[in-house]
Amino acid sequence: MVYITKRFDIAKDGSKYLMEDFASLVGKNEAEQGTFFKYDGCFEDIACAIKRFIPAWMIAMERFFKLVVFNYIYGNGDDHLKNFSIMRIGEHYQLAPAYDLMNTCLHIEGDDLGLNGGLSLTLEKSDVYERTGHPCRLDFERFGEYIGLKKKRIEMILDSFSLLPDEVEHLVNNSFLTEKMKRTYLRIVKERIQRFKRKSE
């Protein structure tokens, strides 16, 4: 299997946009944090860096929040600090397009979230999260509010992940995955959606 992605860091004239990943922006590196430095942190760290480095941070924050929820629902347990970046276009920085969006649970049993600190080290976890070890919708609602998003926008984003779109099922069933892996992929996503929808007391 080969992973191919279109370069988004090259301008039409062939020049490269300046890019910096969030491991660098939050000061994590192998020399100080060790081999697994890119997993050392929480998503709150990225949110704080977005506010610090991106002038139009509210727009970037909403995109970031969508990515965090997407990665959870679609089983990407490898969404670490180096898989989020900012890029400079003209005089301003913005959140780089999403990349490395894969269902890693097809191959590796790992954590629900790619960073070892989860969503936040300071936010209270829902009783569902505490009891099962898996976040539910309430945890993402709290996280969205904590990073500065409006409640109405949070609800709209979370509602969009409450059902498996027909297009996803169609794409998976028509992919080059084996029949067994197709079933596994869809099972993982459906299980995540059910977990996501659990009510917290």
Where are these predicted regions, by residue range?
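Anionic ligand-binding catalytic core segments
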Residues: 1-81, 85-201
